[in-house]
């Protein structure tokens, strides 16, 4: 609406919602015959945010079944069927507990955090990331190697919850239903068998600091980081319903397990397979809590990770499948890159097998496959944007083994396969 302000010939504009004039507010936004001020816009945003928070708990209460969760994991992670089953059941029960826990006051359902143990590059982190996508909940990854006790140089454990808050756009209620993945958890083990020798601020001290956070407590989280802004107001976050997944390679744990199994198998006719005869993943399947204690985790910490999932080594056939089958498979990624240059990228079966064999020799699991592909395709990716008429790039076994350059097929004479530059 428009009014004249006294003797002033110019008209003064007013907000159609609160009635304030354009001189009383910072901004007045015009619409067809109406106006709204910046204060009313902010108020509307607050109302919408409050309704969204309330809607978090008003869904139909349905949770994907373990089989549905496992099927989704299969689309992104190859192999590891046992670990997928363990994770699917644990996560299904966790979110079922959140949706139905308050309906029966007689029985209180406890939280089951998860410990993932497996060799490097076998899919621990990818499993956790895929789970977070499946449930559309806030997800954050933390690196245990950067954590220290409060008061020492390094990150406090509360920073993990701060990252989760940032992932949920500082929506506290949404963050309280999120998933936290703590990687490299094996790097915070006790540095000495004698706990009283010296203060272990990045090992046992971090385990103790994580205890209450993982079990469930109200954490005071500084929105801007606690050490640089000590005067700020703290946000209160209840960690009771946050699912913690810890993962680590636990190098050397297989030897501890093998020693324990060897001690049990004593007597006439007892056959014990030498550690060299069994792969690391096979030995880790036999892991017991006592092995984790001997490795350096404190009993209280092991007790707060009741669900144990061990992952297997990836063999050559699994690595070949990883290269081609998942939705975001490496071969599909590089084929997309070459499509952007109007060229088709093809790998022969022998080439994929040779690449997988190289990955096993490097002992870096699936993580090392990208660097192998980069090495094979680097020169081609460097030269291709400057070349004209290349319609196809073919990688065969000799190319994968470094014996020759990828084969380039030119559009004007597709019958002639030209190795190297034209």
From Swiss-Prot:
Binding site for Zn(2+): 15, 18, 37, 40
Keywords recorded for this protein, A-Z: ATP-binding, Chaperone, Metal-binding, Nucleotide-binding, Zinc
Domain ClpX-type ZB span(s) in chain numbering: 3-56
Domain of life: Bacteria
Keyword Zinc belongs to the record: yes
GO CC list: HslUV protease complex
Protein family (similarity comment): Belongs to the ClpX chaperone family.
PANTHER family linked: ATP-DEPENDENT CLP PROTEASE ATP-BINDING SUBUNIT CLPX-LIKE, MITOCHONDRIAL (PTHR48102:SF7), ATP-DEPENDENT CLP PROTEASE ATP-BINDING SUBUNIT CLPX-LIKE, MITOCHONDRIAL-RELATED (PTHR48102)
Task performed by this protein: ATP-dependent specificity component of the Clp protease. It directs the protease to specific substrates. Can perform chaperone functions in the absence of ClpP.
Protein name, as recorded: ATP-dependent Clp protease ATP-binding subunit ClpX
Originating species: Zymomonas mobilis subsp. mobilis (strain ATCC 31821 / ZM4 / CP4)
Gene designation per UniProt: clpX
């Amino acid at each position: 609406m428009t009014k004249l302000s006294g003797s002033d010939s110019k008209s003064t504009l007013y907000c159609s919602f609160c009635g304030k004039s354009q001189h009383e507010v910072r901004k007045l936004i015009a619409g067809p015959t109406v106006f709204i001020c910046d204060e009313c816009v902010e108020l509307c945003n607050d109302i919408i945010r409050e309704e969204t928070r309330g809607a978090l708990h008003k869904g139909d209460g349905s949770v994907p079944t373990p089989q549905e969760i496992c099927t989704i994991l299969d689309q992104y992670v190859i192999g590891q069927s046992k670990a997928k089953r363990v994770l699917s059941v644990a996560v299904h029960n966790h979110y079922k507990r959140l949706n139905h826990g308050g309906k029966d006051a007689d029985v209180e359902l406890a939280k089951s955090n998860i410990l993932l143990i497996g060799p490097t590059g076998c899919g621990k982190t990818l499993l956790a990331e895929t789970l977070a996508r499946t449930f559309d909940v806030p997800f954050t990854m933390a690196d245990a190697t950067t954590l220290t006790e409060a008061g020492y140089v390094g990150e406090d454990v509360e920073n993990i919850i701060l990252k989760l808050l940032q992932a949920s756009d500082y929506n506290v209620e949404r963050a309280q239903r999120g998933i936290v993945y703590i990687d490299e958890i094996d790097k915070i083990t006790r540095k000495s068998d004698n706990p009283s020798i010296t203060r272990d601020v990045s090992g046992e001290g971090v385990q103790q600091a994580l205890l209450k956070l993982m079990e469930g407590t109200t954490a005071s989280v500084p929105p801007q980081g606690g050490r640089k802004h000590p005067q700020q107001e703290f946000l209160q976050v209840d960690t009771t319903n946050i699912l913690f997944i810890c993962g680590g390679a636990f190098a050397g744990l297989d030897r501890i397990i093998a020693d324990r199994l060897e001690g049990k198998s004593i007597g006439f006719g007892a056959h014990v397979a030498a550690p060299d005869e069994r792969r690391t993943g096979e030995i880790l399947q036999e892991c017991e809590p006592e092995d984790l204690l001997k490795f350096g985790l404190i009993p209280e910490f092991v007790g707060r990770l009741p669900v144990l999932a061990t992952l297997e080594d990836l063999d050559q056939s699994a690595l070949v499948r990883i290269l081609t089958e998942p939705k975001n498979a490496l071969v599909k990624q590089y084929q997309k890159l070459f499509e952007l240059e109007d060229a088709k990228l093809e790998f022969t079966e022998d080439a994929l097998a040779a690449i997988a064999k190289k990955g096993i020799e490097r002992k870096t699991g699936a993580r090392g496959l990208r660097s192998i592909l980069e090495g094979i395709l680097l020169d081609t990716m460097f030269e291709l944007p400057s070349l004209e008429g290349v319609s196809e790039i073919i990688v065969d076994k000799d190319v994968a083994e470094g014996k020759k350059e990828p084969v380039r097929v030119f559009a004007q004479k597709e019958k002639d396969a030209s190795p190297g530059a034209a």
